[in-house]
Amino acid sequence: MKDLLKFLKAQTKTEEFDAIKIALASPDMIRSWSFGEVKKPETINYRTFKPERDGLFCARIFGPVKDYECLCGKYKRLKHRGVICEKCGVEVTQTKVRRERMGHIELASPTAHIWFLKSLPSRIGLLLDMPLRDIERVLYFESYVVIEGGMTNLERQQILTEEQYLDALEEFGDEFDAKMGAEAIQALLKSMDLEQECETLREELNETNSETKRKKLTKRIKLLEAFVQSGNKPEWMILTVLPVLPPDLRPLVPLDGGRFATSDLNDLYRRVINRNNRLKRLLDLAAPDIIVRNEKRMLQEAVDALLDNGRRGRAITGSNKRPLKSLADMIKGKQGRFRQNLLGKRVDYSGRSVITVGPYLRLHQCGLPKKMALELFKPFIYGKLELRGLATTIKAAKKMVEREEAVVWDILDEVIREHPVLLNRAPTLHRLGIQAFEPVLIEGKAIQLHPLVCAAYNADFDGDQMAVHVPLTLEAQLEARALMMSTNNILSPANGEPIIVPSQDVVLGLYYMTRDCVNAKGEGMVLTGPKEAERIYRAGLASLHARVKVRITEYEKDANGEFVAKTSLKDTTIGRAILWMIVPKGLPFSIVNQALGKKAISKMLNTCYRILGLKPTVIFADQTMYTGFAYAARSGASVGIDDMVIPEKKHEIISEAEAEVAEIQEQFQSGLVTAGERYNKVIDIWAAANDRVSKAMMDNLQTETVINRDGQEEQQVSFNSIYMMADSGARGSAAQIRQLAGMRGLMAKPDGSIIETPITANFREGLNVLQYFISTHGARKGLADTALKTANSGYLTRRLVDVAQDLVVTEDDCGTHEGILMTPVIEGGDVKEPLRDRVLGRVTAEDVLKPGTADILVPRNTLLHEQWCDLLEENSVDAVKVRSVVSCDTDFGVCAHCYGRDLARGHIINKGEAIGVIAAQSIGEPGTQLTMRTFHIGGAASRAAAESSIQVKNKGSIRLSNAKSVVNSSGKLVITSRNTELKLIDEFGRTKESYKVPYGSVMAKGDGEQVAGGETVANWDPHTMPVITEVSGFVRFTDMIDGQTITRQTDELTGLSSLVVLDSAERTTGGKDLRPALKIVDAQGNDVLIPGTDMPAQYFLPGKAIVQLEDGVQISSGDTLARVPQESGGTKDITGGLPRVADLFEARRPKEPAILAEISGIISFGKETKGKRRLVITPVDGSEPYEEMIPKWRQLNVFEGERVERGDVVSDGPEAPHDILRLRGVHAVTRYIVNEVQDVYRLQGVKINDKHIEVIVRQMLRKATIENAGSSDFLEGEQVEYSRVKIANRDLEANGKVGATFSRDLLGITKASLATESFISAASFQETTRVLTEAAVAGKRDELRGLKENVIVGRLIPAGTGYAYHQDRMRRRAAGELPAAPQVTAEDASASLAELLNAGLGGSDND
């Protein structure tokens, strides 16, 4: 029997292959695949249901319908295998050959393949250099094309209409050759000399200067070279032979009632065959040209529809008016072959059921219903029953299991022991959505889930369902246990923090037991230890919250890792002493000696993991959960209406607000404020009132007054149930309590605008009808948003996974010295993210020095773990250069040092880890939590007043970076540079706060001066931009002509007059070319020079500038010459949330991007056009100046004569990532994208490690554009894989040749996924047709490097445990020792089979 199995295994042996190539099929190739020509459109005989001969299901071509049996029934049984029946011509073999044998149709006239014709850019059109319209007119028989001009004046490829053709025939006779239809195009393609054409084009490319022409030429050269190199022939894009798909892949299925369901392909094939046969007949009869032509056109259309229905003209529809599904539709889209059957398969040995809570389970267990387990583990049970001799055959075992005999359950118990199962909850947004557990058999029909893993699954018990999968092989079980067990996934891969964290009831229970209460029963006792505390509590002698003294023994690890005991008397409460009993050895008592909220518990588990490792943490987590549940039950915390205490002040606050609103309304009616101002003010008033009410309410809820032991009143934190739930972090928030007991506040309309009448009632008082109606607005919008958000978030995740799927850690250290400089994230006065959080788990790129000395604090290539980070903090280091995947030098993949710590495991990452997918999941998974549109938080709270000063919060010294300044007449500094930053440095040299200081700010304190906390250090006018003089002297007006360039305005109230510069649009013709400016001269009337340059101090005034000086006035440096009003309220709606993240990763250009300086130099303005200004930057070194046209309405940040550096902002706006990359480099764009993405997530309180975003940025930067080819084979302007250029340049430099120069490109994630080198991966993502067309023409090889390609071809992925297998395969192939597959011929096999069968018959049945 063993030999038989061996033989059957040998039959299904797959070939070892390393790459997949796609190319055009030549007619001969198609004929070589084919097993015969399909000549008739018939499918099966309606009476006998046997396939018709030569038809679409013909058994002679495609193989027998029944296993080992010919059609007429002459040969049956295995012994005739391989015989071809002389009566019906069918080979006797297995039916499954009908899935792999192809046929063909010999087309009577060539037809163009629609993909190469219509998939843009049209390959045929590009190759022939003809417009697509013309080619189509030829193909569909509307005009002629000249193939050979001969001695006539007709050009090759010239298009002739019917009339022109007839005229030419009369004139030239047979001198020339012109045809129509696909034959003509085929002839043109055949007669092309590709190499010759390439040469001509390359010469042309070197001569031409026009940009568009060069682009077109490079496109053609690339296509021609692709044809030359891949060995494809252009004429193969025209089909002369059409392959026919094997019949079992387009089946005809009999339905009941004698009807048949058929695949649409059969209809499409039938049309082609019918038209082809008709055309053959017409050609034999030598029918008139016009009839033949029409038939040929119809054949072309039929073939088009078969290949890609609907690509040209109207789609051919079936009987039910639905377009037929063509071959192209079979593979593309969500229901296509790639995404439906290759990337997502359904698997056997799985089941699904509803989940319920299993609070008594251990962390590694799940409850599995007996019924399910019995079904899932059937084969194992059969095996065991046979092994034990309880059943003689499988059949008997089956019967036993069906009868559910008692012994079966015992066997099931054994089988299930230590056999993990996988639990999965859809949607699986990250890898923690599938984890392994050991099953525990339970009664009932619902799966029981451990409460602590709910956070990872995002599961709740309101009817969620989960699927169970059984890992069958030993390897699978091993992987499930070692890698996927829930106990091995304590930390989240997104941020390295524990994800097995108690929530809700457990938190409430722990919080309740660790709270203290004034004057509780048993206060002041002194106890010998936690055990006694528990005893007293159980006996009812002391309350859980009583403040007592307890003797506590703590254990601390010494240098050798041994535990040292330390006993002391601690002030604590009974509850905390009881909780201490479950805390593992090695943690300090201070960790539980506090009221434990959710954050504190999370920190406790994190500390436990870092100090003690995995096993104690898992046990501790379980114990915490049991304890939490127990004490939550004892606490009796519940929600009652009396817990919602409405503050007394509420009424008066609301009436005050109403009075203010009435006042504003009066002002509006008397015309003092505009409608917009009134609306804004009203909303501000209500937002403030709302805050006051909620503050009063929280103060009221937070504390209660009690009598202490000495009979005095004392404030203590309240034991109000609702407050406790919110305070502990178990459920609810201040905002929700506000709606219950304060006031509901302002509501938003569905479009995001705020309704100005707030809801003053709360839910305890109840809403009236109007208020209820307003509320429904917001509620419905919430639901609609959620639905949209989920879909959008899923799509973002899909794009991210696709772009990063092939990124795997492939080596230990690439040795690069490059890296990213990490600094703490500081916004305004607060540190949003300290340095330690940013560098923890990264590897240093260079030695970190002790600040102010040359001592090495941390050497290069050190993985910064917690202890190193403590050291950095102690020495107040505020910038560390760390390795990053963006600057990693590995060719394919990245190295472990550039990535750093594996966040989910806590050590440096292993080789073979799929970091790309992890990054994509970490960014995509919280996507559903991000709001679609940033809801105005609490209405108008997000609308802050315009900033006009900087007030520091801490004491320290000021440091100004890239600041230029002058001292004004009152001795204060005035800033005259654009992007000045002010940092506050504490006494250890750490940056505490950081602010942007605008141009024209007056500084109260200078660089390096000490300030106290709360001091204002800079002031400016937020509504105008000043023009500041850098020199002292007298003002001289130039080109300031009243009525032409300026106009005088007088203020009615003050009587002061000022000059206003007219915008060029408002000027008269005479004033158009004048450029109003203020010149500073000395007493003799000579120009004053700007210090440090040889430029005269002349300040050109932009339009709308207001001048409050008169000609000839004396001024001193730092004075304001003019003010340019800024359009305030120009804050456009910032896209927030998910769409913003998508925009960043898609690298979309913002609508009105900031304009950056392309080169460093001096600014001047050239000649203006109607709507634009000409900005000229002249480099200091005297090289070519750079010009750029800028629309006049853009506000410029620079004045004439100012010096800018490359990449400085010339005009404000959102920065375009492409500009940042071009002008400031890779690190700057990485920093930009990382910070912007983090801002969105931070706003939602989601923590994601920077490296995940960096991984995606690396993938966005994986293409480069060749600027100068050097000695390489690249084309100028060609876009190639960055790693390819790197490898090519390395080889060239090794041989002493000149490498190619290039610039890095930033692609959006969709573009980057489609531009990947693997066509299989790109085709399975989007735009399948285009990708495959392109790949086929270029004859691309897919090296199967990524994960997706390997999943599609059905082998282990080159990551994780499959990494070793692939490495091994490569190594063996390099050594040339791939084992040859044992060749079993059919003859040997049949002989051994016959032998076996005979032996089986002859022998007895009991073996």
UniProtKB/Swiss-Prot annotation:
Entry annotated with the keyword Chaperone: no
Keywords, alphabetical: DNA-directed RNA polymerase, Magnesium, Metal-binding, Nucleotidyltransferase, Transcription, Transferase, Zinc
GO molecular function, one term: magnesium ion binding
SUPFAM superfamilies in the cross-refs: beta and beta-prime subunits of DNA dependent RNA-polymerase
CDD domains documented for this protein: RNAP_beta'_C (cd02655), RNAP_beta'_N (cd01609)
EC assignment: 2.7.7.6
Entry's Gene Ontology BP terms: DNA-templated transcription
GO CC annotations on file: DNA-directed RNA polymerase complex
Catalytic activity: RNA(n) + a ribonucleoside 5'-triphosphate = RNA(n+1) + diphosphate
Cofactor(s) recorded in Swiss-Prot or TrEMBL: Mg(2+); Zn(2+)
Presence of keyword Nucleotidyltransferase: yes
Sequence positions that bind Zn(2+) 2: C814, C888, C895, C898
Residues binding Zn(2+) 1, per UniProt: C70, C72, C85, C88
Primary enzyme class: transferase
Gene3D superfamilies: 1.10.132.30, 1.10.150.390, 1.10.1790.20, 1.10.40.90, 2.40.40.20, 2.40.50.100, RNA polymerase II, clamp domain, RNA polymerase Rpb1, domain 3
InterPro entries: DNA-dir_RpoC_beta_prime, DNA-dir_RpoC_beta_prime_bact, RNA_pol_asu, RNA_pol_N, RNA_pol_Rpb1_1, RNA_pol_Rpb1_3, RNA_pol_Rpb1_3_sf, RNA_pol_Rpb1_4
Function: DNA-dependent RNA polymerase catalyzes the transcription of DNA into RNA using the four ribonucleoside triphosphates as substrates.
Oligomer and partners: The RNAP catalytic core consists of 2 alpha, 1 beta, 1 beta' and 1 omega subunit. When a sigma factor is associated with the core the holoenzyme is formed, which can initiate transcription.
Protein name: DNA-directed RNA polymerase subunit beta'
Organism: Citrobacter koseri (strain ATCC BAA-895 / CDC 4225-83 / SGSC4696)
Name of the encoding gene: rpoC
